Amino acid sequence: MPAIQPLLYLTFLLLILLYLIITLYVWVVSTITYKTAVRHAALYQRSLFRWSLDHSL
């Protein structure tokens, strides 16, 4: 068995781990951003609706 084999295996494992961490991080960030954006949009829409109602009277 060549000496490079375990090193290659370790590198491959590290790359997979890195990929998983990055994917998880991106997923969490996008989920949080999406939820925050939706909440802000709902609040903005509500306040805009209220404002238009107040000004129409």
UniProtKB/Swiss-Prot annotation:
GO biological process, one term: symbiont-mediated suppression of host NF-kappaB cascade
First-listed, main subcellular location of the protein, grouped into a coarse class: virion
Name by which UniProt lists this protein: Small hydrophobic protein
Record topology, Virion surface segments: 1-8
Similarity annotation: Belongs to the rubulavirus small hydrophobic protein family.
Sorted UniProt keywords: Host cell membrane, Host membrane, Host-virus interaction, Inhibition of host NF-kappa-B by virus, Membrane, Transmembrane, Transmembrane helix, Virion
The UniProt record lists the keyword DNA-binding: no
Subcellular location: Virion membrane; Host cell membrane
Membrane-topology descriptor: Single-pass membrane protein
Name of the gene: SH
Short name of one Pfam family: SH
TM segment ranges: 9-29
